[in-house]
Amino acid sequence: GRIIDQNVLDKVDYPINFHDGPLPKYGGLYSSTWAILKNENTHGCCWHLMTSKIDSGDILSSKDFRIEDTDTAYTVDLKSLIYGFEMYETHILRMIRQNSIRVKKKNNKIISYFGKKDFSKIPNKGLLNFKKSLKYNYKLFRALSLSKEKTSLLFQPKISWKNKIMAVNNFNEISVDSIKFFEKNKNITYNNNSIFVRKNNKYYQLKLKKKKF
């Protein structure tokens, strides 16, 4: 997207925009990623009036929803889009047709905006590190598992294996019976385009994307 000049916005009766995050708490880019990294239990989305300042217009309609423990940034984004379409059909269109725009009062107690300058705050540049806890690694995987269109190296969960950086596509616990090739005293190994990890007496499979960096 891009910033639209105010003189252009003034030519439109109701310039509106959809934002896939709750405003003003999660303005800017990749709101679902930051919400997961910050251990949020809920997220949201909204339609708002547009101004020359990004994500700062009055709220027309909003929806909050739960972030499940298994949700990734991608599935949170999907929920936002589904609720966004529902709000457009049930609220936004009706207000436009009736020429009766009502705004909702914003909660300005927490205002934050995440831009490109914040990308450096992604833990370990998105590299999983199994010297750290399983909870840490799974959260990082979930937060960086976005849609296929977002292919930036930074915004993908990754793992380093024998001096190669590889993007992780899936992260699942598996049965110990399915592991036949683990060497003794080793907690991580590679087999058939997957990294296998032994952690806290459990086994996990990290399926890799074919693209290597």
Where on the chain are the PLM-derived regions?
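Donor/substrate-binding cores of folate-linked one-carbon enzymes
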Residues: 1-115
